[in-house]
């Protein structure tokens, strides 16, 4: 009987040790699983946060892009309107009555005749310029109206064509014109 008791004691101690080892293993497995779950949750949370940030960034880029397109379209529309106003001004100048043309040319010539020796104009204004100016008529130039005065050696040209005057006025008052048209 002594051997059986020793065997039982050994078996009981072994079983207790196995139970302790199994409990420790179960606890370690449980801890590993909990850690893995926590790590997975953190990874999922990080990825979800990154995905949300990416979505916000993409949305902001799309909004910015759309705003830029709207501004570009508005600027193009405004430019078209300003170009139309400019072209209407050209049409108005071209269709001025003869008396108004003569009045404008006379004012330019009276102011600047002494600054040169040659004068140029477009073909339509040639007779009128010859009549109004004492300068030598030097030929026709391509313009909607007005004239150009040149000194005797051709080194200085004063451009009083309506094209140049309108261009200068347009450049100087573009912002004001835009403010009037578009508020």
UniProtKB/Swiss-Prot annotation:
Pfam families: vATP-synt_E (PF01991). GO terms for cellular component: plasma membrane; proton-transporting two-sector ATPase complex, catalytic domain. GO terms for biological process: proton motive force-driven plasma membrane ATP synthesis. InterPro entries: ATPase_V1_Esu. GO terms for molecular function: ATP binding; proton-transporting ATP synthase activity, rotational mechanism; proton-transporting ATPase activity, rotational mechanism. HAMAP family: ATP_synth_E_arch. Component of the A-type ATP synthase that produces ATP from ADP in the presence of a proton gradient across the membrane. This is A-type ATP synthase subunit E.
